[in-house]
Amino acid sequence: MNEKKPYTISETSDGLTSITMAGLTELFKTRGTALSFALALADRVSDRRTGIFHLQDTPDGKLQMIMHKTGNVITFKDYDQAAKLADMLVKDLLP
């Protein structure tokens, strides 16, 4: 039985890679850029090189991921939940 993924990955008609999670969509110029994002999240660090997002802890102990381009905020219950999502994204984005 396959686990339902908490995101969808698709390609737009103009060639961008779209990742939708928690009802929010982020567009990446290439699948490689999306993979870079997923790998950075998997490592639980901000991707300073591309400036795609940063992570911050909330006062109630949760983890927020703030996307720099759109300002979208995705809240995870903890680092483990974020890491699990990232691992799933990496597997789906690898060629």
Each predicted region: which residue ranges?
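Positively charged, low-complexity terminal tracts
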Residues: 1-95
